[in-house]
Amino acid sequence: MTVLHSIDFFSSSSAPVAIEARAPQSAFPEHHHDFYEIVIVEEGAGVHVFNGNPYTLSRGCVCFVRDHDRHLFESTDDLFLTNVLFRAPDAFRFLSGVGHFLPRECDGVYPSHWRVNGQVLQQIKCLIACLEHAPKSDRVEDIALHESVFMQLLVKLWQGCQTQAGDDQEGRLYQLLDWLQNNYSEAVEWPELADRFALPLRTLHRQLKNKTGMTPQRYLTRLRLLQARHQLCYSDNSVTDIAYLCGFGDSNHFSTLFKREFSQSPRDLRSQL
């Protein structure tokens, strides 16, 4: 597995933060690094496989990667990212309490993926632009100013995550996307789901396609296929059981869709492991 080292990304040993833009981000194999990373999705779509678990990416996704996490990007489609790198939450000279504004693992569950709305993405652009420039010098005041901008960015993201589930259409669409990520195996009737999240059905179709580049049904099918691939790799369940566990009513249809998506059948994938 590829290991990325901080010496290759930070401008100096004293620089607390580095910015790496990916415009666009192409597919990138599984890797980890000796620093922390905040991945901010500005445009496009793709799949982020984080510690073996697949997450679909779209505009407004924010991913928090620790120094012991492994991840990769695949199926990217005009995926524009900004990566904010920092050495560790406790590695700043003048900041404390950074961890309060980062995801916290609880009972073995790490909420690595957040969502923020377009307004927050716009607000943080100027902060990212400031962070792109290394501190003017190694003087304590320049380091302190640089670190203070990073803290502003963290607070903006944290506040944006807390408020993204607001009662406007964009907030309700984000709630729906999160619901699908966690309930992909359930039978979905789109008119009922639209009512549940107080979205007109046509608006749901239009906005979801605008956010993800896919129709709602295509998005759901892809979620299910990604989860099925994960189970094929990391569980002992049979192909038939996995098909049903991931929301497919027929294992033959599942195999057909899987081969169309990944250019190999579920059994072929299993045989390679």
From Swiss-Prot:
GO terms of molecular function: DNA-binding transcription factor activity; sequence-specific DNA binding
Protein name, UniProt field: HTH-type transcriptional activator RhaS
Domain HTH araC/xylS-type: 174-272
CDD domains per the UniProt record, alphabetical: cupin_RhaR_RhaS-like_N
Record Gene3D superfamilies: Homeodomain-like, Jelly Rolls
Biological process (GO), any one: positive regulation of DNA-templated transcription
Residue ranges: DNA binding: 191-212, 239-262
One GO cellular component, as annotated: cytoplasm
Superkingdom of the organism of origin: Bacteria
Subcellular location per the Swiss-Prot or TrEMBL entry: Cytoplasm
Organism: Yersinia pseudotuberculosis serotype I (strain IP32953)
Keywords: Activator, Cytoplasm, DNA-binding, Repeat, Rhamnose metabolism, Transcription, Transcription regulation
Summary of subunit composition and partner proteins: Binds DNA as a dimer.
Residue numbers marked as site, Interaction with sigma-70: 241, 250
